[in-house]
């Protein structure tokens, strides 16, 4: 048998992207292409060696050119020594060829007639032809055309993590390129690490920025590779278009698509469904965080079940006897999963996978310290710090998900007194962390300051308007005009804080993490419908309109039930309010709140020069219903709270929150039986929308 000469490997060509190929339209082969850019979707380019042409393509010809249905034969003479090949060698070659045919069949890179010819001709002549064909085909060029399903992929390809069946040959460059990976790591440390605290910052810097090994794991370890790709992916999703062009000279969608493909490919290799490594689960959680920011569909909500099961299989909820470093990493990871589970349940909406009992019984927050205070060799316990630390915002988020589960998904918490008590405990735990926090010091301090105030408003709103109302097993209280105004003010404060992050330059790094919540938006729309305070409605309606536009832009293509219901309710409220309010409340700004005009139109402080612009004289923590001294007095309900001394000069809080410190909101409200008008209108609108959708489905069938 003649020995084949070495063949030059073909360079990968830039072919039509996946979407243009599926839609069968001409692709201009740009990155991203014009068709995908105009459609507003992510362009996934395809790069692979071109198929044989000219004289090479004539090797596959038809027996009868006049017969279009004739099978294809291979015009290669059988080798002279074919009869001397051992049976086992022939079987091995046939097995290899069948594997190639199976892989090519999945990607449609070879004609169906040729596959049929390979499968049906089983005589000796066909076997000799197959053997000759195998020797004449560049096996490497065929392997890159279709992906192989590894038996250790843990089923992730079945879950759709791979996106499509045509892998991009340049996916690894985003990880192997030292400069790109270092820049994305820097973006992660700036934009993601302050709000999603599951990694150890110094260890990450030594690994991705200084080139050292990560926590003693060998280089090329599957878990380490998947974590690096997940860091690049979530960092790419946190970029703005301006930052993407400034750092990488390309669009955000292009860098996100490449990073996502790299992350999904490395996750398949690391098999998070089967891996016992906590590092692999960290990578999977970061993938879910990035996917949720990029894709508003229910994909992350579905995949959360796997993250919760894996965490329980690794026994993350249980306090172990590991060293201090491992304990902190396990606590951070488990509470981050609890937070993501709570967030995805609110966005759908549905009940969380982790029950209230599981979340509260395993609630053991990590230390309120900086990452520089400990390392993997730390064996002793480290006490909590005072003031703002690397973990302040994360600790507040952990308390938010714990209180949110009790207020929204716990049927046992029915009486208003206990609900308001939960709110008060939440305020004590979170606002304690706000002591000594100067919002003018850093963008992170500014963001933490305003988000904590937003969380407090959200907790108070959930105490009065929990999601449990939609289950009809909790009586809806009726409120008078003043109390209804307080509800509208709470909802407006949440929407204003969201808009502030999207307009103030100090919130640019964290805008990817902040979206318009549909619950306060729905409550604000409903309250505007029945509110009798004309001046309040006149101030509120532009904020509601702008928040609605941003919400619709963010959930485009998903959450249809909520989106359609909100849109119909908005049309109903517009018809009532706009004729009476006139054109003074019209909104013509961008729904992304990216301009100064939007900030001025919404009366949101854009860049306050000092703290005096966001607070007023006398607005102190001591003005709350609980005194500052109570913050430093430990008790059973504060066993998990950081100990801090009484501040001699406590920081000031948003005056809107202080104006709502009434006995009704803090001490509890009286039990009333009739339904409130605004919530009744909201539930009526939901019922009407569901009935209309059912009628539409019947008409289609």
From Swiss-Prot:
Report the principal subcellular site.
nucleus
* Cell compartment(s), UniProt: Nucleus
A Pfam family cross-referenced in the UniProt record is Fungal_trans
Q: Which SMART domains match?
A: GAL4
What's an example GO BP annotation here? DNA-templated transcription
A single Gene Ontology CC annotation of this entry is: nucleus
Is Nucleotide-binding set as a keyword in this record? no
Q: Which GO terms describe its molecular function?
A: DNA binding; DNA-binding transcription factor activity, RNA polymerase II-specific; zinc ion binding
Q: Which SUPFAM superfamilies is this protein grouped with? A: Zn2/Cys6 DNA-binding domain (SSF57701)
- Positions of the DNA-binding region: 17-43
UniProt cross-references to InterPro entries, sorted A to Z:
Sec_Metabolite_Reg, Transcription_factor_dom_fun, Zn2-C6_fun-type_DNA-bd_sf, Zn2Cys6_DnaBD
Q: Which domain of life is it from?
A: Eukaryota
**UniProt key word Metal-binding:** yes
- Keywords in alphabetical order: DNA-binding, Metal-binding, Nucleus, Transcription, Transcription regulation, Zinc
Write out the function statement from the record.
Transcription factor that specifically regulates the neosartoricin B biosynthesis gene cluster.
Could you tell me what this protein is called? C6 finger domain transcription factor nscR
Q: Which organism is the protein's source?
A: Arthroderma benhamiae (strain ATCC MYA-4681 / CBS 112371) (Trichophyton mentagrophytes)
What gene codes for this chain? nscR
């Amino acid at each position: 048998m003649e020995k084949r000469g070495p063949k030059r490997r073909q360079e990968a060509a830039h072919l039509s992207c996946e979407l243009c190929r599926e839609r069968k339209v001409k692709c201009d082969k740009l990155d991203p292409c014009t068709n995908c850019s105009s459609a507003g979707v992510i362009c996934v380019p395809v790069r692979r060696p071109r198929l044989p042409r000219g004289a090479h393509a004539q090797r596959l010809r038809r027996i009868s050119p006049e017969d279009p249905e004739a099978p294809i034969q291979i015009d290669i003479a059988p080798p002279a020594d074919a009869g001397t090949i051992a049976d086992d060698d022939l079987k091995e070659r046939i097995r290899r060829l069948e594997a190639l045919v199976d892989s090519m069949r999945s990607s449609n890179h070879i004609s169906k007639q040729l596959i049929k010819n390979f499968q049906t001709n089983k005589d000796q002549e066909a076997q000799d032809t197959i053997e000759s064909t195998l020797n004449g085909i560049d096996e490497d060029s065929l392997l890159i055309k279709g992906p192989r399903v590894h038996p250790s992929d843990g089923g992730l390809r079945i879950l759709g993590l791979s996106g499509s069946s045509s892998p991009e040959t340049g996916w690894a460059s985003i990880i192997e390129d030292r400069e790109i990976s270092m820049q994305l790591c820097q973006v992660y440390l700036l934009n993601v690490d302050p709000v999603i605290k599951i990694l150890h910052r110094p260890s990450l810097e030594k690994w991705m920025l200084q080139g050292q090994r990560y926590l003693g794991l060998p280089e090329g370890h599957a878990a380490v590779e998947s974590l690096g790709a997940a860091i690049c992916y979530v960092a790419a999703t946190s970029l703005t278009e301006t930052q993407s062009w400034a750092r990488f000279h390309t669009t955000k969608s292009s860098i996100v698509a490449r990073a996502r493909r790299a992350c999904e490919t490395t996750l398949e290799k690391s098999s998070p469904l089967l891996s016992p490594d906590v590092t692999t689960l960290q990578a999977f959680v970061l993938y879910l965080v990035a996917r949720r920011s990029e894709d508003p569909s229910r994909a992350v909500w579905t995949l959360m079940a796997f993250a919760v099961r894996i965490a329980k299989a690794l026994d993350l909820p249980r306090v172990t006897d590991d060293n201090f470093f491992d304990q902190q990493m396990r606590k951070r990871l488990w509470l981050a999963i609890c937070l993501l589970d709570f967030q995805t349940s609110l966005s759908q909406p549905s009940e969380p996978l982790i029950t209230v009992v599981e979340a509260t019984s395993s609630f053991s927050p990590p230390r309120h310290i900086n990452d520089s205070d400990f390392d993997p060799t730390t064996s002793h316990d480290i006490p909590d710090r005072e003031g703002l630390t690397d973990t302040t915002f994360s600790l507040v988020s952990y308390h938010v998900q714990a209180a949110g589960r009790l207020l929204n998904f716990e049927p046992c918490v029915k009486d208003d007194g206990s609900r308001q008590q939960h709110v008060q405990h939440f305020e004590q735990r979170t606002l304690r962390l706000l002591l000594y926090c100067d919002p003018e010091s850093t963008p992170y301090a500014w963001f933490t300051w305003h988000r904590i105030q937003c969380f407090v408003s959200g907790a108070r709103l959930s105490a009065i308007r929990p999601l449990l109302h939609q289950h009809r097993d909790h009586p809806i209280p009726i409120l008078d005009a003043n109390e209804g105004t307080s509800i509208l003010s709470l909802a407006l404060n949440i929407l204003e804080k969201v808009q502030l992050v999207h307009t103030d330059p100090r919130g640019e790094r964290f805008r990817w993490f902040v979206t318009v919540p549909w619950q306060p938006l729905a409550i604000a729309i409903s309250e505007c419908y029945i509110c009798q305070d004309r001046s309040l409605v006149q101030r509120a309606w532009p904020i509601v309109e702008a928040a609605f536009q941003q919400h619709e832009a963010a959930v485009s293509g998903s959450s249809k039930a909520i989106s359609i219901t909100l849109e119909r309710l908005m049309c109903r409220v517009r018809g009532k309010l706009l004729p009476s309010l006139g054109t003074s409340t019209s909104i013509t700004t961008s729904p992304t709140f990216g301009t100064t005009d939007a900030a001025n139109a919404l009366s949101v402080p854009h860049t306050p020069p000092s703290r005096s612009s966001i607070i007023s004289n006398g607005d102190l923590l001591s003005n709350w219903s609980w005194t500052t001294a109570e913050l430093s007095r430990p008790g059973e309900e504060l066993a998990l709270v950081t100990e801090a001394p009484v501040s001699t000069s406590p920081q000031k809080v948003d005056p809107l929150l202080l104006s709502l410190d009434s006995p009704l909101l803090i001490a509890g409200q009286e039990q009333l039986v009739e339904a409130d008008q605004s919530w009744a209108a909201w539930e009526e609108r939901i019922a009407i929308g569901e009935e209309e959708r059912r009628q539409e489905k019947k008409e289609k069938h």
